[in-house]
A protein has these predicted regions:
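Short charge-dense sequence patches
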Residues: 22-28, 80-85, 130
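Short solvent-exposed beta->alpha transition segments
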Residues: 35-36, 40, 51-111
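Internal amphipathic alpha-helical segments of the cytochrome P450 catalytic fold
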Residues: 50-51, 141
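Short, low-complexity N-terminal intrinsically disordered segments enriched in polar/charged residues
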Residues: 3, 12, 19-49, 55
Length: 150
């Protein structure tokens, strides 16, 4: 799938996502895991530790974006926006099929994907929407599989 198609699919999912707002505080630790993974990754990018951010990403991300290309691209984008002043998660939703309420395990399954939108204010009063997807890996950890800023 091309990057453009993937971003279009992510945008479509996010348009149907649920607002996070005050929900983040009432989420269980398991429900917060994808959001926590996205936030940790963003903090790493904010600190300009681009090699670490690339290493933290999902295998699908690393396979589609070579480390040097990621580093150069994210550095250029972040220089245009400046430092982060405030970031707030706005929406979160499943990509594809959500877990079934009657599933006795209630557990997230490998390959499950979550889309997250952040409303971010940068230095110089620039605002942007950061769109992310995180995927549950074989190791049981949530990792960033996609990132787009607009």
């Amino acid at each position: 799938m091309s990057l453009r198609r993937a971003l279009a699919a992510l945008a479509a999912v996010l348009s149907m996502a649920l607002p996070v707002g005050g929900q983040a505080q009432s989420m269980s630790p398991e429900q917060r895991q994808p959001l926590n993974a996205a936030e940790r990754w963003l903090v790493t990018v904010d600190a300009e530790r681009y090699a670490n951010a690339w290493a933290m990403a999902a295998e699908s991300f690393k396979a589609s974006v070579p480390q040097k290309e990621f580093r150069d691209g994210i550095r250029r984008i972040r220089q245009d926006y400046g430092r982060v002043v405030l970031r707030k998660s706005e929406k979160i939703g499943f990509v594809g099929e959500a877990p079934k309420p009657d599933d006795p395990t209630g557990a997230a399954k490998e390959g499950m994907q979550i889309a997250i939108l952040f409303d971010t204010k940068f230095a110089g009063s620039k605002r942007a929407t950061e769109e992310m997807s995180v995927v549950l890996g074989k190791d049981g950890l949530w990792r960033v599989a996609g990132y787009y800023i607009r």
